[in-house]
């Protein structure tokens, strides 16, 4: 049935709503192995009545949501009451709760402790990066909802347990799942049954620190910083130091039999050479693509800020002055190396940050949409938004001088080799809005996000610059929740009138 042809007919409108109700009510939690049928068909549940569009929520039925939060529902009601643009209200209501609605698995362990698995969406595994970003916007509500606080606590503890298991892994399987998908067990690395994938990415160890620190700052709950926390921190420090490559290549290698060049590493799994200069090597980017030069600059900035947060916790909560000092010394070393090796004197933009370097003098001048990115440095708080080098870098990455910036008839933004040419990631558009100090620029970004959802009411991994109906990943919870985070931040920053002018 094509709902675009429904006009002023109560019978047909009622029938459409009945079909929707049946579709929602007949789903169960296993339905979320594929949410395409209820959530992603363009315009499937956008009805028109007297030439006015009626937007029907694309959230799953209450009984089918994987996790319920009174605080999140209250925040949705609070925000939607303030927004006058019906389509923007609809998109916010769809996107902001997508993580808890469709990806959170909360468990209570035998000892009564909290344990939360946060799937990335259409892939049934928990990335340390994605999970830390997916639940991040809910932390501000933790004191208003005990169930939400326990879910967040369980996420952090699960991240600590994962780091204890293997600090080099980026994604983990659900130990409560009786039939996990061991898709990458044939990878030539130290794979374990508990792992989904073992790509070494610096940010995998940073996102848990960022989340734990913010949870502690908001709630004051220090109960998460016990034995598992200390073991995880030991692994984080040991891994960061090993990947400074001062004592050789280190223990980590990775190879995969694949047709994708960036899904494996050169030089027998060790990657391209680096010169030990104090920076931390990252075999892969936050896109899960192999680095060209292993000193990945945005991730090294992220490591500095994360280590400083960890040092504060260790000093204040654990009274572990030695480990806190170890974090601070390492952060100082990496920060000094960044100032020495990460800056490029660009003939057009002046001093900018390179995306990757190798310590030998080689620099890669690009940006990739995935966060941490050069554009997202200010969003993560790794640099001041008014830092002149950051502003120069921001101008560079949002231009056609960045090889992975694409501009078309549908939109513009940064992509990356993970999806390829001409594919813009909405995440980059959101990062431009997050880091903007210009109302016209922010408004332009929001309008572009609204215009490139292919009529689905959700964010996607990427869309074609000339045709948003050509998109990848129909169910990518991180980008959905990030959109909700952006709208809330803009309202908190006094930008409601801007949003209501769209």
Label each region the model flagged.
Residues 124-152, 156-263, 477-491:
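Aromatic-rich carbohydrate-recognition surfaces in CAZymes
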Residues 128, 164-168, 172-175, 237-304, ...:
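Extended ligand-binding clefts on enzyme/binding-domain cores
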Residues 187-193, 198-200, 364-384, 422-502:
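C-terminal capping/lid segments that line or modulate ligand- or cofactor-binding pockets
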């Amino acid at each position: 049935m094509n709902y675009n042809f429904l006009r002023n007919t109560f019978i047909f409108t009622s029938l459409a709503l009945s079909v929707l109700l049946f579709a929602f009510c007949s789903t169960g939690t296993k339905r979320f192995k594929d949410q395409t049928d209820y959530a992603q068909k363009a315009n499937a549940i956008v009805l028109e009545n007297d030439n006015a569009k009626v937007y029907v929520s694309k959230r799953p039925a209450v009984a089918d949501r994987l996790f319920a939060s009174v605080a999140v529902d209250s925040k949705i009601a609070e925000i939607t009451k303030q927004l006058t643009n019906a389509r923007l209200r609809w998109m916010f209501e769809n996107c902001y709760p997508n993580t808890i609605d469709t990806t959170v698995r909360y468990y209570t362990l035998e000892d009564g402790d909290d344990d939360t698995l946060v799937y990335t969406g259409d892939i049934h595994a928990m990335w340390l990066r994605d999970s830390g970003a997916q639940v991040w916007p809910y932390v501000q509500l933790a004191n208003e909802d005990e169930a939400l606080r326990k879910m967040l606590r369980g996420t952090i503890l699960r991240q600590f347990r994962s780091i204890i298991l293997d600090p080099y892994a980026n994604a983990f399987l659900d130990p409560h799942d009786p039939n996990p998908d061991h898709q990458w067990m044939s990878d030539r690395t130290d794979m374990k049954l508990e792992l989904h994938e073992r790509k070494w990415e610096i940010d995998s160890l940073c996102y848990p620190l960022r989340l734990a620190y913010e949870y502690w700052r908001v709630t004051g709950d220090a109960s998460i910083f016990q034995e598992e926390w200390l073991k995880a921190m030991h692994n984080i420090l040991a891994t960061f130091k090993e990947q400074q490559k001062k004592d050789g290549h280190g223990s980590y290698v990775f190879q995969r039999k694949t047709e994708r060049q960036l899904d494996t590493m050169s030089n027998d799994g060790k990657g391209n050479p680096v010169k030990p200069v104090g920076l931390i090597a990252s075999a892969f980017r936050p896109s899960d693509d192999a680095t060209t030069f292993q000193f990945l600059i945005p991730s090294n900035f992220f490591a500095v800020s994360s280590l400083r947060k960890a040092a504060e916790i260790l000093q204040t909560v654990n009274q572990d002055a030695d480990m806190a000092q170890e974090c601070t010394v390492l952060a100082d070393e990496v920060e000094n190396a960044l100032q020495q090796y990460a800056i490029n004197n660009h003939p057009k933009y002046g001093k900018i940050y390179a995306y990757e370097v190798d310590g030998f003098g080689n620099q890669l001048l690009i940006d990739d949409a995935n966060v941490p990115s050069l554009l997202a440095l200010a969003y993560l708080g790794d640099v001041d938004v008014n830092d002149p080098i950051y502003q120069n870098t921001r101008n560079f990455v949002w231009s056609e001088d960045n090889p992975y910036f694409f501009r078309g008839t549908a939109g513009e933004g940064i992509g990356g080799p993970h999806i390829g040419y001409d594919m813009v990631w909405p995440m980059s558009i959101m990062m431009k809005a997050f880091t903007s100090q210009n109302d016209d620029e922010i408004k332009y970004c929001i309008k572009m996000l609204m215009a490139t959802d292919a009529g689905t009411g959700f964010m996607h991994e990427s869309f074609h610059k000339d045709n948003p109906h050509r998109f990848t990943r129909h169910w990518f919870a991180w980008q959905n929740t990030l959109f909700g985070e952006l709208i809330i931040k803009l309202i908190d920053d006094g930008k409601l009138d801007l949003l209501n002018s769209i």
